[in-house]
């Protein structure tokens, strides 16, 4: 009986070859999966350039889980080294370079956020690697060897670089290193498959070239669509405000997903759920509610999904996040650590301070890392959501 690869086909934009490859398409990947005598090593890398992962990032993670469930090894690379350069893909100017401390703090939250997606428990199904393991050890000779595998012309063919060069916007030499470093990650972990968004085709192709250079069999590149945000217009992005964060309160998730435009619903179901597309309700409003329910259930469980649904149906526009009145604060300015104790999110100011230092406190989804954070006036906090860990929230109100 032929193996069912419907999980592989769902939501894929492209399984790509280099021009010289005759069989690097989805059928040859299926053949490799069906005949391999060992688990394939399936790579996905994410740079901790911010504290949050949103639903757009979950798409390759979900495909990675599909490979795990088929018996293969997911290699999740936390790009703690490459994050300090920043991927120039799609950028019209150089990214701000992060400090080592920025990256370390951001990386702390990533594994907790993806735990509901990936299989962390089955032996041999997951490796978590930090690319500083190998990239920080590259000497000048090895870096020169990597640089010698590509030409300036090849780099300028990359869409973001080409646009900037045409507009005479600066391109800094260290930015040319990013595709080579991402590619070298594939060499270091001996990847058989690399997952990425459609905007990552160039970088994944560089990985294939470097694997050939170092005598390895080149990886398959599996490209996945870029998720359009909740506005139905631009790609999901925190900076555009059209995102749903994995760390958000269940009620907030539910409310946002109920508002996904009708024309985007099928894409959301295909990329973010396992529900059969041909079994979806015909009514767009029913589809929106089903989408919200299904995704909240994935990340928070059925009870949380039911509570979020009931809150939305009863007119709870803020997703039933408990409220704390700032009138109960004796005086301002006030320290955030004190507020954590006063709201009951922590047992005391001291515990609040420790939670901040551990990276477990967020305000409107943004992690707060300074234990001495002070707010001067109540207006600074009106309507904002204070969070400790994954499941403790309050909305601050006047």
From Swiss-Prot:
Subcellular location field: Cytoplasm
Documented EC number(s): 6.1.1.1
A GO MF term: ATP binding
A Pfam family reported for this protein in Swiss-Prot or TrEMBL: tRNA-synt_1b
Record flagged with keyword Protein biosynthesis: yes
Entry GO CC: cytosol
Catalytic activity: tRNA(Tyr) + L-tyrosine + ATP = L-tyrosyl-tRNA(Tyr) + AMP + diphosphate + H(+)
Matches recorded under InterPro entries: aa-tRNA-synth_I_CS (IPR001412), aa-tRNA-synth_Ic (IPR002305), Rossmann-like_a/b/a_fold (IPR014729), S4_RNA-bd_sf (IPR036986), SYY-like_C (IPR054608), Tyr-tRNA-ligase (IPR002307), Tyr-tRNA-ligase_bac-type (IPR024088), Tyr-tRNA-ligase_bac_2 (IPR024108)
Residues the record lists as binding ATP: 238
Renumbered ranges of motif 'HIGH' region: 48-57
Residue span, S4 RNA-binding domain: 334-398
SS bond list: none
The entry's keywords: Aminoacyl-tRNA synthetase, ATP-binding, Cytoplasm, Ligase, Nucleotide-binding, Protein biosynthesis, RNA-binding
Domain of life: Bacteria
Motif ('KMSKS' region): 235-239
Function (record text): Catalyzes the attachment of tyrosine to tRNA(Tyr) in a two-step reaction: tyrosine is first activated by ATP to form Tyr-AMP and then transferred to the acceptor end of tRNA(Tyr).
Known partners and oligomeric status: Homodimer.
Similarity-based family: Belongs to the class-I aminoacyl-tRNA synthetase family. TyrS type 2 subfamily.
Name of protein: Tyrosine--tRNA ligase
Gene: tyrS
């Amino acid at each position: 009986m032929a193996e069912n690869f419907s999980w592989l086909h769902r939501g894929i934009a492209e399984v790509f070859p280099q021009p010289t490859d005759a069989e690097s398409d989805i059928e040859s990947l299926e053949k490799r999966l069906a005949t391999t005598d060992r688990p394939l090593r399936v790579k996905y890398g994410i740079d901790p350039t911010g504290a949050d992962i949103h639903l757009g990032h979950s798409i390759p993670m979900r495909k990675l889980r599909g490979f795990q469930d088929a018996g293969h090894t997911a290699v999740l690379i936390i790009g703690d080294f490459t994050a300090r350069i920043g991927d120039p893909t799609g950028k019209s100017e150089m990214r701000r370079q992060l400090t080592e401390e920025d990256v370390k703090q951001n990386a702390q939250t990533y594994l907790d956020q993806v735990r509901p997606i990936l299989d962390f428990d089955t032996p041999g199904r997951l490796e978590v690697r930090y690319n500083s393991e190998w990239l920080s050890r590259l000497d000048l000779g090895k870096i020169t060897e990597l640089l010698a595998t590509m030409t300036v012309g090849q780099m300028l063919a990359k869409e973001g670089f080409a646009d900037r060069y045409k507009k005479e916007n600066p391109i800094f030499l260290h930015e040319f290193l990013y595709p080579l470093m991402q590619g070298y990650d594939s060499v270091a972990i001996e990847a058989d498959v690399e997952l990425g968004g459609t905007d990552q085709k160039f970088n994944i192709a560089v990985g294939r070239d470097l694997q050939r250079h170092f005598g390895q069999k080149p990886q398959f590149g599996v490209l996945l669509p870029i998720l359009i945000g909740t506005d139905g217009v631009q790609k999901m992005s925190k900076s555009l405000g059209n995102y749903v964060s994995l760390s958000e309160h269940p009620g907030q998730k539910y409310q946002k997903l109920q508002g996904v435009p009708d024309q985007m619903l099928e894409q959301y179901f295909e990329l973010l759920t396992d529900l059969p597309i041909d079994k979806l309700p015909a009514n767009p409003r029913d589809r929106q509610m089903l989408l919200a329910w299904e995704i909240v259930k994935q990340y928070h469980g059925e009870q949380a999904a039911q509570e979020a649904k009931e809150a939305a149906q009863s007119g709870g526009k803020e997703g039933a996040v408990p409220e704390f009145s700032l009138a109960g604060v004796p005086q301002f300015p006030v320290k955030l650590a004190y507020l954590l104790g006063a709201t009951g999110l922590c047992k005391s100011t001291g515990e609040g301070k420790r939670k901040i230092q551990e990276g477990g406190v967020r305000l409107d989804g943004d992690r707060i890392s300074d234990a001495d954070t002070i707010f001067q006036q109540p207006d600074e906090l009106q309507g904002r959501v204070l969070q400790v860990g994954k499941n403790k929230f309050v909305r601050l109100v006047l």
